[in-house]
Each structure stands twice: as C-alpha cells, then as structure tokens.
C-alpha cells in the first residue's frame, strides 16, 4: 500500500509546474559544482553563499551576496570540488567560522576563515593534505562535510574521494591547530559503497556528504544505489554500523546534493537532488524519522525544479530578507550559476 501511495504521489507531483527561483547568482567562469550557505549571526541580511567553480588549474571559490552579486573570488584553485561551512572553530583559542574546500588535484583541503563582517581569509595557504598514500583517483578529494560535535565542540571534516572500495570509502579527519598551524588528523575510515555506475561495468562515485550536527548523523549519496546513514561521531559505540539506506528507488538520475533543513527539537528535512537535465527534482525526507523509529525516513515529496543537472545544494531555515522561511541554493549547470529559492515555495509542495 505504501508503495502505491508513493507512486501516486510522484505521478501527481510530476504534473506540477517547476519551482521558480527567487534569485540567481552571477555565473562562474567555467564549471559550477557546490554551494554552502554561511549565516551572518550579527546581521543575517549580510549572509553569504560560497560556491565552487571546479575547473582544473583556474578554478575558484566564489562568494556571493544574497542578491546574487559577487562579493569575492578566491582564485586560482586546482579543481576545487565541494565546500562546506562550520561555525565556531577554535583557532589559537578564538572561535572563527570556516569554509573548507576540497582542492581535488592538489590532494588537500583549503580552509578559509570567515570574519564576523563576512570578510574571508586563508587560514592554511599550503592546505591540509588528505587521502595520503592512495593510488590515482582514490587520492583526489571530492565531497566534504564538516561536523561540530556538540559535547566538546571538536570539528571534523568527512572527505569523499573520487573513487574507493566497497568498504571504508569515507575518511574522517579532526581539524585542529598547533602553534598557529592548522592540522587534519585522520580519526577513522568508514562507509559502504555499492560501486554501481551509470552503465554496467563502470564504477560510480560518492560525492555528496552532509552532517546533521544536532542529531549526530552523517548521510552520503551512493549515487546509483541510495543515501547511506551512519553516526557522525567517530567515538560512538556503533560508529561502524550503517543505520539506514534511504532513496533506494524512484530516482531518475544520480543521487547528488544533500542538505539538512534543521528546525528545533529535531524537526525538519533531509533534502536530496535527483540530477536531471533542466529538471532536477528535490527529494524530501523527514529529518527525525517516523513513528517507526529515527531511521525510518520515507520519501515525502519529489518536487520538480528548473535547475539543470544539479550537483550540489544547500539549505538553511534561518529567516533572511526575501526568504522568510529560509533559503535553498542549487547548482545550475548550463548557465554556470546557482539558483536561490525561497523555502516557502518548497514547503508549499510538502504534504
């Protein structure tokens, strides 16, 4: 019966007009990939959208205002793939917000501090080496998610390489600092991978990773299989245990971007992109599970958009100017930009 309900829901939603963005950013020069929203706690209207242009050698990290205009371009970077932000990372005993980028062809992370006024500076010009000792492609970092552990404020980076084996695909590093120099210390490897690709015999990949800091879960997209869920804390007694696999069916394209729309008391949504040419769909799941348990997270909606072949996306529930219930940012491939949607329009499509 549940399967029938889902099929009927998808058929109805497929007939709906696609969501219209409230705004769009200026284009990046080459090849957009992943956005990350930074909230300015002192002045939310001055919040920013960080976004990658993943061109080899001449790529960059682009910083946009909420009206879509460019504030800053950090170039050149050598195929910067994905970006994430975290708040209150301790550097020299002082908290600072950070944006961390995977610089794929340099096999490292780039870490940028975000001042209270939104100014951005490089905290580790030489970068932080990751995936050391791995063969070609397996030593290229693509996906990244940052996790701030609630009990002690420790900050971790969870990194997904370009390729890997069927186990221990993800690498988790604790970020720290010694005598003013940043460090990335490997604390664990974890995560199953189906190796399913777009065609038989071709190995796929894992790129999208997101952490729900408050609830302590990490999700990642095994692109042709499903969305896998684990505990984010490397010290958890069940850290190696897979908790659930979401989205095993109904996707028409790759399972790509992931983001958490977080509300108080664990409410909210896990948002995933179903990557399609000119018609990427938003796949929405309950953040806190169902009456059956926290890891029972059935598909709630498949919402059509006009975004083109979306890789990365991000979302916030913080009210912002023009976005009273929060903001959703989606990569838009052919126009080489990022679309900014009001969450109000998304919520209107939810059951």
Functional labels for PLM-detected ranges:
Residues 312-351:
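Blade-level signature of beta-propeller repeat domains, shared across WD40, Kelch, NHL, RCC1
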């Amino acid at each position: 019966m549940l399967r029938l309900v889902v099929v009927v829901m998808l058929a109805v939603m497929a007939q709906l007009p696609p969501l219209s963005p409230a705004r769009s950013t200026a284009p990046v020069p080459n090849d957009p990939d992943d956005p990350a929203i930074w909230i300015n706690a002192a002045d939310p209207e001055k919040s920013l959208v960080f976004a990658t242009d993943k061109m080899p050698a001449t790529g960059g990290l682009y910083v946009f205002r909420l009206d879509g205009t460019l504030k800053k371009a950090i170039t050149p970077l050598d195929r910067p793939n994905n970006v994430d932000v975290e708040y209150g990372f301790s550097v020299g005993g002082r908290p600072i917000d950070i944006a961390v980028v995977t610089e794929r062809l340099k096999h490292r992370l780039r870490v940028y501090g975000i001042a209270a006024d939104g100014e951005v500076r490089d905290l580790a010009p030489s970068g932080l080496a990751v995936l050391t000792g791995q063969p070609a492609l397996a030593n290229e970092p693509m996906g990244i998610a940052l996790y701030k552990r609630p009990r002690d404020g420790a900050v971790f980076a969870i990194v997904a390489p370009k390729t890997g084996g069927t186990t221990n695909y993800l690498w988790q590093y604790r970020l720290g600092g010694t005598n003013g120099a940043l460090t990335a210390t490997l604390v664990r490897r974890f995560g199953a991978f189906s190796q399913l690709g777009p065609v038989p015999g071709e190995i796929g990949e894992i790129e999208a990773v997101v952490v729900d800091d408050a609830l302590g879960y990490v999700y990642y997209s095994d692109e042709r299989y499903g969305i896998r869920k684990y505990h984010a804390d490397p010290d958890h007694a069940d850290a190696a245990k897979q908790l659930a696999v979401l989205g095993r069916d109904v996707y028409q394209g790759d399972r790509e971007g992931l983001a958490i729309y977080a509300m108080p008391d664990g409410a909210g949504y896990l948002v995933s992109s179903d990557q399609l040419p000119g018609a990427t769909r938003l796949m929405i799941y309950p953040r806190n599970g169902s009456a059956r348990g926290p890891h029972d997270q059935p598909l709630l909606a498949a919402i059509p958009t006009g975004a083109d072949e979306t890789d990365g996306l991000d979302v916030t529930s913080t009210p912002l100017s023009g976005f009273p219930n929060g903001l959703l940012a989606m990569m838009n491939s052919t126009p080489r930009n990022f679309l900014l949607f009001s969450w109000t329009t998304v919520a209107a499509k939810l059951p």
